[in-house]
Amino acid sequence: RKIAGICRSIKPKYEYTVEVYSIVVPSGVRDIMREGDALSHCVGKSDRYWERIEQQEAYILFLRKTAEIDKPYYTLEVEPNGTIRQKRTYFDRQNDDLKDAEQFLKEWQKVVSERLTESDREKAEKSKVLRLQEFEQLRQDDIRIHTGDLAGQRLVDVLVSDLMETAA
């Protein structure tokens, strides 16, 4: 219930559509779990995402092709200021097609930055501090990815390379 309320409250701020791509805010937990199942990645299976949404540290949003708005494409983990922590498609991958969407994502970040309130900016500052603390802990613990295409890589290195900070 709390997550559904948060999703409703952020929808006007984060949803965005142009001819080719759209950012879609899920309605709640069921949409997020369906997305994780459809793309066979971890977003619907880990409590940490629910906790981050409830604390408004980060949100789960969907990158979609506008012509196929209901078809899962990429799942995004996004901080309150539009900083994108993760961009993942099937099996936690990033395919070459993501490069085509990068300009759209940068444009979306600019649009979001114009919609932010002071409260959003404060949440974003806290979110960044928590992210940096998590990265440091992952480095210290030398956490490795165990499955999939990224098996053997340090998780922190993958997360850092995935990060798309907003210019705002």
List where the protein language model places each region.
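Catalytic-core elements of nucleic-acid end-processing and repair enzymes
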Residues: 1-168
